Each structure stands twice: as structure tokens, then as C-alpha cells.
Design a protein with these regions (language model features):
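Sec/Tat-exported extracytoplasmic proteins
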Residues: 35-38, 59-63, 90-94, 186-193, ...
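Active-site-proximal beta-strand elements of phosphoester/diester hydrolases
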Residues: 25-38, 151-164, 203
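Intrinsic structural disorder
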Residues: 8-9, 163
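Active-site neighborhood of phospho(di)ester-bond hydrolases with catalytic His/Asp-centered motifs
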Residues: 30-32, 67-72, 97-103, 196, ...
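Short, solvent-exposed beta-strand-terminating loops
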Residues: 20-21, 201-205
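Bacterial N-terminal signal peptides
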Residues: 1-8
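Extended active-site neighborhood of metal-dependent phosphoesterases/phosphodiesterases
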Residues: 15-17, 84-197
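N-terminal active-site segment of His-dependent metallophosphoesterases
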Residues: 13-85
Length: 205
């Protein structure tokens, strides 16, 4: 079974391996729109501490196998310090995680490339960089407990920030290249799974 917890708001040189446990369970905690702001004001610091406390409570009580952050994570204040504080917290939990950007993350004062380098510096991050040095769209296999065959697929996609065409809206959307990539990835996984569609979840802002 799969459990997803939604909250608004083996360490090696290799990426962590995602795997169902012996009971056939894989628990995911999802955090979104956290809008962490460090050292902007006393109020923002107070709210940030509440957010970190909530993250700690979920990590320690629910003990998820994987954490997904779906955008608008660290958006104001000393954003480099905010990201480092978040990564330090995740290192204490030793839980693999993935980040997708939201529309407000690029407003934080750090470029997408800078944020991407910070995120991928963590040994618990499953994110990788694309050719532009930004977080790549990810297709992640969750393996069965006893083998190396995927039992489920997770897709983490960047939905962009601002519209390239202001006449049709303020914020961006998935590109056709992303849609084709997702379609082809799903088809490939189906073929590799003896023609059976692999159970999948997609995460994005």
C-alpha cells in the first residue's frame, strides 16, 4: 500500500535507492507552499520555526520513506541560509527527498542554477541536474522489497514560473517537450514491465 501525507506549507556517493518495505508499504510525505523566510523579520523567523517544527514532527512520527517538496519552499529573506537550514534538517532525518520548484522559488534572490546546486549537494537528494544546470524532471523507480524490479514509478516535474506569453496568463505551464517526455517514459516503463502499466504518481507545483 502507498501512504501520502500532504502538508501545506543508505548514505553513499550514489543517489538513495527507493524501495518498498517488508510489509509492502512505501510512505510519502509531501510538503508544498512552505514559503520559508529566514532573517527577513521577527514574524517571518517565527513562522519559519513553526514550519521546521511541523516538518520535524511529520518526519519523526510518521517516518516516511520519501519526502517530496512541491514548490514555493524558500521564497524570501536569506534564502541561501533558509535552504541550508532545510537541508541540515533533512540530513538529521536521513530520509531521501526530491524537490520541484514552484512559481515563487525563482523570486527568492537565488537563480534556479544556484538553488539546484544547493539541493543536489545533499546526499539524501534524489534530484539531478539537467544540461542547463537546473533541476531535471525526474522519473524515479520504487523497487520491490526483495528485488531490483520496479513496483512503482514517481514523476517529479517542474511546472515553470512565469508565462512566456503574457497575453494568455501570468504563470507558466508544462511544455510540450515535458508532456512528450512523460508519455515516452510511461510507455518505456510499461514495455519493461512485460506490457503491464506500472502504478505511478506525479508530483508538481
Amino acid at each position: 500500500s502507498i501512504t501520502i501525507l500532504l502538508a501545506s506549507l543508505q548514505l553513499s556517493a550514489h543517489k538513495p535507492v527507493l524501495r518498498f518495505n517488508q510489509e509492502g508499504r512505501f510512505k510519502i510525505a509531501q510538503f508544498t507552499d512552505m514559503h520559508i523566510s529566514v532573517d527577513k523579520s521577527d514574524y517571518c523567523n517565527e513562522q519559519a520555526e513553526k514550519t521546521f517544527a511541523r516538518l520535524s514532527r511529520v518526519a519523526n512520527q510518521e517516518k516516511p520513506d520519501f519526502i517530496v517538496f512541491t514548490g514555493d519552499i524558500v521564497t524570501r529573506g536569506d534564502t541561501r541560509k533558509g535552504w541550508q537550514r532545510l537541508l541540515d534538517s533533512l540530513s538529521t532525518y536521513k530520509i531521501p527527498f526530491c524537490v520541484t520548484f514552484g512559481n515563487h522559488d525563482p523570486e527568492s534572490g537565488l537563480s534556479r542554477e544556484e538553488m539546484s546546486r544547493i539541493i543536489t549537494s545533499s546526499p539524501y537528494s534524489v534530484n539531478s541536474l539537467n544540461s542547463a544546470g537546473q533541476l531535471a524532471d525526474m522519473d524515479l523507480d520504487v523497487l520491490s522489497y526483495s528485488g531490483d524490479k520496479p513496483s512503482m514509478a514517481l514523476y517529479c516535474l517542474d511546472s515553470g514560473d512565469y508565462s512566456p506569453d503574457k497575453s494568455i496568463g501570468k504563470y507558466a505551464w508544462f511544455s510540450m517537450d515535458q508532456i512528450l517526455w512523460l508519455r515516452n517514459s510511461c510507455l518505456k516503463k510499461t514495455q519493461e514491465n512485460d506490457g503491464n502499466v506500472l502504478n505511478s504518481l506525479a508530483f508538481f507545483h
